[in-house]
Amino acid sequence: RRYCLNSEALEFYEEGDDLPEGARPDAEIGYFAGGCFWGVEHGFSLLPGVLDVVSGYQQGTVDRPEYKAVCAGTTGHAESVKVVFDPDVIEFGTLCKYFMYLHDPTQLNRQGPDRGTQYRSGIYTVGEKQLNIARQVLSEVQASEEFSGRQIVTELEAAKTFWAAEDYHQDYIAKTGRVCHVNIPAALKAIGRDPADLSAGH
């Protein structure tokens, strides 16, 4: 038995896979790359309406890439996250705007101290609808006062195969308590959320 979480993306979970708890047949998927995936994964996991977040590798040229090869820059992959979300609770456009403030989209091939093409900024879209939404959000953010004089370098591409990262990368911040590069307060403010509004489960 298979569960389709996004018919447009043809994303399926086989029976026996870890289906996100509470996932509905019409849940959707978004893909985002914004530096080290540990922090990006954690940032998205806090949002109500986000059902599951997986760290992985995307937009590369090698099947089943491994962390060391990705870090060496030989596979062409970006560290990205797959976000499974309930569109009735949180819209794709809101996720895009949150993401643009979660990391620094003006840094080319790096985030904070992490440097390399694997740390590039990107939104990888599924279908024309997501592409148009992401394009509009990027345009609005670029025109905002916060980014005056700063050029956004986030790449906007059709999503290629997403490869889940090794198990030890999943939920890394939650498991270790380490601090990462993301700016969660700024991202929440950008979408009109207060940290106090986040449920205890997030």
Residue spans for each PLM region:
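Flexible coil/turn and secondary-structure edge motifs
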Residues: 1-202
